[in-house]
Amino acid sequence: MRDVVLYVEDHPVNVLLMQTVFELRPELDLVVAVDGLSAMAATSKLRPSLLLLDLRLPDCHGTELLERMRCIPGWQDIPAIAVTAEAEFMPAGTSFCDVWHKPLRVPTLLTRLDRVIAPKARPDDPAPVRRQSMFSRTTFAV
């Protein structure tokens, strides 16, 4: 089973950067929600391995969204990372396990992503096939 990462981000440039990162990790699937409402709607269909949450969403703060997600059975122990431009934000007092400060850089993101979701080498898995579309593995939650 493939690992799924739910990324909640409303800024298209940040989504594009994250899509670029995930193209370099073909064993992972990225699901993008652009606000808290679409993220909560996606929770009924997903059981992600990781949550990446922007803090300044158009309809709620990322910490509020994470609190709501933690009320869903089975979602209490999913690692959650705040992805923010708020330089002063610290995860103490929240259930975020880490903070990734913007601006984000691809090499740093790859290293941090690999620390949270260790690449799984399975001898019976076929080698990843390059896809025609650069972002063909990204799903947008509606």
Each language-model region and where it sits:
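Hydrophobic/aromatic residues positioned on beta-strands within the core alpha/beta folds
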Residues: 81-83
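C-terminal output helix
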Residues: 104-117, 125
